[in-house]
């Protein structure tokens, strides 16, 4: 082993040790129902439910959208950078509900991937956030990368010292006093982008346990709603 500050020298051989076990089994088809909103010979649009992972990863090797797609379709194309993810050209977070486009042919895969890369597609999401958002609309810019305190979560790095560029445009749809319904349009597609960006500007997503959205912060103007909100959480 070497120290974290060790500088590699030319000609040295580096061996990496992975903390997680390697998944050797191939992706298998699973009879999981999918909600198809649209389908033709080239693509399909599905309504992804909450609490469902898009593709296999550490801790989630079964019960994913990818497993379900293999059952419903034969010979789905794969992107080189999306290994083991048949027909998938974009992703949604596990707890996000929304429409996903699935490519059924190689040509559709190439064209759809290019559209997402060139940012000619529009991705809009509705989110209920804590607080009365100050501006009717706004733009959040800040690199997003793994949190240094919790690797499962993402953090915003405004100075661009870490993470990848991320841009979220938001617009207020309705104000409820202690919460606000906003529409978020993404220019980039980073993991937990909306969740991390909205928390960054002080408006965590309602009931987002991972980012602190399940509680009202002490000392805020919303503390008086604490009992009411706690009762709401009991009903969720």
Regions found by a protein language model. Name each.
Residues 1-236:
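RNA pseudouridine synthases
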């Amino acid at each position: 082993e070497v120290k974290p500050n060790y500088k590699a020298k030319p000609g040295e051989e580096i061996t990496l040790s992975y903390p997680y076990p390697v998944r050797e089994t191939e992706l298998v088809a699973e009879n999981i129902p999918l909600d198809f909103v649209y389908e033709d010979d080239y693509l399909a649009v599905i309504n992804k439910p909450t609490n469902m992972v898009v593709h296999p990863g550490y801790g989630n090797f079964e019960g994913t959208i990818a497993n379900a797609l293999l059952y419903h379709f034969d010979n789905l194309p794969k992107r080189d950078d999306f290994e083991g993810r048949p027909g998938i050209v974009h992703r949604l977070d596990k707890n996000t509900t929304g429409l996903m486009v699935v490519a059924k042919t190689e040509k559709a895969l190439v064209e759809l991937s290019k559209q997402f890369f060139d940012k000619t597609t529009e991705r809009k999401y509705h989110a209920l956030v804590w607080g009365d958002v100050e501006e009717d609309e706004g733009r959040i810019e800040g690199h997003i990368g793994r949190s240094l305190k919790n690797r499962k979560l993402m953090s915003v790095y405004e100075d661009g010292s870490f993470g990848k560029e991320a841009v979220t445009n938001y617009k207020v749809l309705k104000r409820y006093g202690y919460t606000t319904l906003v529409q978020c349009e993404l220019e980039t597609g980073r993991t937990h982008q909306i969740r991390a960006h909205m928390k960054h500007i002080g408006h965590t997503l309602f009931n987002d346990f991972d980012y602190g959205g399940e509680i009202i912060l002490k000392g805020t103007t919303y503390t008086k709603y604490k009992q009411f909100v706690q009762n709401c959480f009991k009903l969720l």
